[in-house]
Amino acid sequence: METLESELTCPICLELFEDPLLLPCAHSLCFNCAHRILVSHCATNEPVESINAFQCPTCRHVITLSQRGLDGLKRNVTLQNIIDRFQKASVSGPNSPSETRRERAFDANTMSSAEKVLCQFCDQDPAQDAVKTCVTCEVSYCDECLKATHPNKKPFTGHRLIEPIPDSHIRGLMCLEHEDEKVNMYCVTDDQLICALCKLVGRHRDHQVAALSERYDKLKQNLESNLTNLIKRNTELETLLAKLIQTCQHVEVNASRQEAKLTEECDLLIEIIQERRQIIGTKIKEGKVMRLRKLAQQIANCKQCIERSASLISQAEHSLKENDHARFLQTAKNITERVSMATASSQVLIPEINLNDTFDTFALDFSREKKLLECLDYLTAPNPPTIREELCTASYDTITVHWTSDDEFSVVSYELQYTIFTGQANVVSLCNSADSWMIVPNIKQNHYTVHGLQSGTKYIFMVKAINQAGSRSSEPGKLKTNSQPFKLDPKSAHRKLKVSHDNLTVERDESSSKKSHTPERFTSQGSYGVAGNVFIDSGRHYWEVVISGSTWYAIGLAYKSAPKHEWIGKNSASWALCRCNNNWVVRHNSKEIPIEPAPHPRRVGILLDYDNGSIAFYDALNSIHLYTFDVALAQPVCPTFTVWNKCLTIITGLPIPDHLDCTEQLP
């Protein structure tokens, strides 16, 4: 029914056709709409009859009128009959297909309108409240006026009655350019409401237009989407607001707690200062009393000595005035002895007197404490430590990490974190993932030795400085363990080979003494081999072989199950780099591949990556790659060497050279 209704709708007024005219182009148009088109083409004071042509609003075909004007066009009786039957068959209601778009808009407005509507037909003053609004008449009626104006007979039975709504809602929005025309379409180009005449003869003639319902649906959907986003954003803001309020509360509580703590700590400092003041004051008083007591005793002794000396001085002076020799000699000896004794006794008192002990050396110096008090402030997290890679040391299974801190005074402890480094790309993810790190907590020194590490492996280390206020971490530092150290196993050496006392050098020795047979010993004629004393089953390892003038030798690796009576590389259990005079080959399972090193290596480096299945040979002095075996190792492997002339010396336990380390470097 909706599709049929759209076919019965006038393209100008967007209502069901009323008195439709059949145009020569086979389209239809309401008589009144056609008349409005002619009026819009008229100049001022020009009669409508002077217009003899107009364009079909549907196909733009030019319709030429006869002298009769619009009356000369045929009425589309068939279409009018279809419309009449359509209206009769339609069921009245808010979802009825007979409803016009205007009526649906009226219903929508009715639902939202709470204004008091008065009867527009009443002669009474004031008018009665309206009980119905006739959409067809565009008038609101009270019950009495409704019965008088809308008897239950045609054509009034076809009028649409709805709940009362204001007059402005009935009439709808009017066109700004054509005041008597209602807006019934939307100009997409200018983004504004227009009427049919605006599209036919106005400035919107060539603009893109759309039906109100289409634009309504689009804008409503857009508004709903924006509203949903706004509601979502408001919800997020409300959540944020709640967090901010909660944070403010926490700030208030924590600030109050810190203020109380500050008062408590300052009171404690004041208490300590007052206590120390009392203790030091007591010491001063005791020192003063002791010194004054001692000085008072010395003063009394001096006065007593002076009094005794004064009497003796008087007698001596009187004796000196005696001119009679006999009388003088009679008393002089006694007086002289007494003067000598008095002089000696006064001399004894002098060492006991210390005139410099006046408390001026009792100094009070609180400058250090004043500086500390002046520096009182919030405790902050310590500065990040710095890993000193140049001081760090490593073995094949340990690394000793050294670091420094310019803020050691505020550091309570350190925490060492480390993990295997697989490339620069994983540094950020590793730093953000606590599960990836091994952690050593509560370190008090500026160094720590980590044990049980994989040999020949690169690690990332970070050091965290910690105190009560928080912690800060150092920049990542890259350190690596050395390769697994090993020596030559004399029990495996061929009878015609001699192993040095330090088990690091092997040489051909025809005069070598007979050796007892062991399961590990190489036995074949010409297979003058010796094995290392270690079997490797994981990790990355690097060692070097010094070629001491030998021109016939083989260097490689072998499983424990490799036959001892065959040359290394002649079976599936061993891999070797061989030199036979000036011929160089790599050999595995009796398959030989020639290589041409230039210059001839004087030191060969071997890099074993057990986990990734590779055995690589290098010219160690010139950093030149010679060859790499790619193999899935299924058993532990042992370094193996064959010498036909001169000697070979091994250097083991080395770190993997940086130019051979394929992992990406830290910045």
From Swiss-Prot:
Subcellular location(s): the record lists: Cytoplasm; Cytoplasm, Cytoskeleton
- Point out which parts of the chain are RING-type zinc fingers, as ranges: 10-60
| Binding-site list for Zn(2+) 3 | C175, H178, C198, H204
* Binding-site positions, Zn(2+) 1: C119, C122, C142, C145
CDD domains according to UniProt: Bbox1_MID1_C-I, Bbox2_MID1_C-I, FN3, RING-HC_MID1
A single Gene Ontology MF term assigned here is:
protein homodimerization activity
Which ranges are annotated Basic and acidic residues under compositional bias? 499-520
One cellular component (GO) term of this entry: Golgi apparatus
Segments of skewed composition (Polar residues): 471-485
Q: Which reaction does it catalyse?
A: S-ubiquitinyl-[E2 ubiquitin-conjugating enzyme]-L-cysteine + [acceptor protein]-L-lysine = [E2 ubiquitin-conjugating enzyme]-L-cysteine + N(6)-ubiquitinyl-[acceptor protein]-L-lysine
Any Pfam family from its record, for instance, is SPRY
User: What role is this protein assigned?
Assistant: Has E3 ubiquitin ligase activity towards IGBP1, promoting its monoubiquitination, which results in deprotection of the catalytic subunit of protein phosphatase PP2A, and its subsequent degradation by polyubiquitination.
The protein here is known as E3 ubiquitin-protein ligase Midline-1
State the organism named in the record: Rattus norvegicus (Rat)
